[in-house]
Every structure is written in structure tokens, then in C-alpha cells.
Swiss-Prot record:
One GO MF term attached to the UniProt entry: structural constituent of ribosome
Residue intervals passing through the bilayer: none
One GO term (biological process): translation
Protein purpose: One of the primary rRNA binding proteins, it binds specifically to the 5'-end of 16S ribosomal RNA.
Protein's gene: rpsQ
Highest taxon of the lineage: Bacteria
Organism: Orientia tsutsugamushi (strain Boryong) (Rickettsia tsutsugamushi)
Keywords of the record: Ribonucleoprotein, Ribosomal protein, RNA-binding, rRNA-binding
Self-association state and partner proteins as the record states: Part of the 30S ribosomal subunit.
NCBIfam families according to UniProt: PRK05610.1, uS17_bact
Name of the protein in its database record: Small ribosomal subunit protein uS17
HAMAP family membership: Ribosomal_uS17_B
Length: 79
């Protein structure tokens, strides 16, 4: 099974070796035909504490690192 790759923005970098990334998803509501925007937060492994709040990053699914972390940062997309 291929690993999922998502793109999002760092909303918290307060924890050691962990960042919280918000990933936005847009879709058209089937009944109301309006574009709906949904955001989901992921705990992401950042071993070198390189990323700060507001950075755009690309994340990939990985093996479980802790109870809530199963994503890693693979690329920095700039600010």
C-alpha cells in the first residue's frame, strides 16, 4: 500500500521533536453544491526541530513513532 503524502502549514512547534501541521481539504458538498473547506491536524515528527509556526511543509505517512505520531516531514515548501 503506498504511503500518503500531504501538504500543510505548521500551526504549532512548541513540543520537542514534534510539530502540529494543519492540512486543508476542499470539496463540493453533494447536496448544497457549495465548496466546503475542512482542516485536519496531524502530529508530525521533526527530529531536528527545524520548522517554526507558519512554515509550509510536505509530510509522509510512516510507522508509528509514538501514540499520536505516524507522520514525518519530507520537504520544506518555504513560507
Amino acid at each position: 500500500m503506498p504511503r500518503r503524502v500531504l501538504q500543510g502549514q505548521v500551526i504549532s512547534a512548541k513540543s520537542d521533536k514534534t510539530i502540529i501541521v494543519s492540512v486543508e481539504r476542499r470539496f463540493k458538498h453533494p447536496m448544497y453544491h457549495k465548496t466546503v473547506k475542512i482542516a485536519k491536524k496531524y502530529a508530525v515528527h521533526d527530529p531536528d526541530n527545524l520548522y517554526n509556526q507558519g512554515d509550509k511543509v510536505k509530510i509522509i505517512e510512516s510507522r508509528p513513532i509514538s501514540k499520536t505520531k505516524c507522520w514525518r516531514v519530507i520537504e520544506d515548501k518555504g513560507q
